[in-house]
Amino acid sequence: MSDAPQFPPLFEGLALSGSADPFAKAKTQAIMGCDAGLVVYNLAADQLRAAIVFAPEVPLTEAMPVLISCAIGFQNALGALAPPEVAVHLDWPGGILVNGARCGRMRVAASTQEASEVPDWLVVGLELPLIPLDTETPGATPDQTALYEEGCVDVTPDTLLGAWVRHTLVWVNRMEDEGLKPLNAEWRGLAHNLGEEVEWTFGEDTEAGTFVGTDEHFGALLRSGDNTRLLPLSRLLEGDS
């Protein structure tokens, strides 16, 4: 369906096929001690799935914003490849929105969930539907979409994947060199539902309130009445450490 993606130096690709899950494979490879920069991917006809392995050198709280770097990297990559009228936004729990409808998500896992510990590894995953799950009834779920439904049929998965990794690298480098201020400024311009009422589900738990912004490490601030509470970015970590 597509050519092999082109990655920046120090990044190495590992292609999967069939139903194999790149996010799960990347976690397995990380546990086995693979090098940082491994990009595991599965480019199917109906969806793009990929995951990048990172090796943080800072405690988990300071490492988690790499998820934001990856999300902004994807937005920048798709924004550069898609027609100019296509709008791409991000929501705090990792969702991707294209022209206002949900279109895939980011995922994250790490070797620890302890805020003060330095993770051995951190994996960020991307899942992006290319065509609707139900092609017989397009428009049946107006709040959800797929990339090719939004005028992006000329964006090939291999090109988009390579661009995602390149743009992510730019933001990871900026985060390391300049701190979180540039990342925060970019993200605020892309954030979905900022200043609005939200209801987010985390497993069996639901958090609701007015999304008023983030703290210095991109934890979400939700206001309910006179009370404002913090949801750390580590709340998005999947699975057991």
Language-model features, listed with the residues they occupy:
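Long, positively charged amphipathic alpha-helical accessory segments at protein N-termini or as interdomain linkers
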Residues: S2-V40, P59-P65, I72-P83, A101-S241
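Primarily the active-site beta-strand->alpha-helix module of PP2C/PPM metal-dependent phosphatases
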Residues: V40-A55, P59-L60, I68
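Hydrophobic residues embedded in beta-strands of well-ordered beta-sheets
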Residues: L48, I96, G219-A220
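A structural signal for short, well-ordered beta-strand segments
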Residues: A50-I52, G94, V124-L128
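Catalytic palm active-site di-aspartate
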Residues: V88-G100
